[in-house]
Amino acid sequence: MFFTNSSSFQVAGEAAGTWRTLSNDEWGYLLNTRTDASFLRAWKELDSGEHKGLVILPDDTDASVMSGITSTSHLASSGAVFLPAAGDRVGTVVNNAGSISRYWFGTPNEGDGSYAYRMYFFSNDVSVNCDLRERGSSVRLVR
């Protein structure tokens, strides 16, 4: 996989532009503006705490489904997306793995292209900020 521009990635064996990161508007919808957004996402410790991160359920899902998700094997059947708490990277050092994560958006800062938007989560606290694109954050690719 390699990065081709601010929001597009190429995965080996697939056409360029097939994979991308979500935009600022798409992340905003998932995390904040859709109906019951705060009930359709939750910090979870799955598989007896082995996998920690944010679970995001699809639209129109009964929020009670969240309590039944206790392992990674439950994710596909519920249509959920799991964002691991992968920490962040500064230089070659990974910090806070298992407790926080930051995920890049495909939207650069309008005023300064060396910055881009990213989502930060710790437990159930989710926020959005802008940071230097050279900093190490995770990406969630979609088709």
What are these regions (language model features)?
Residues 1-143:
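Conserved positions within compact, well-structured domain cores
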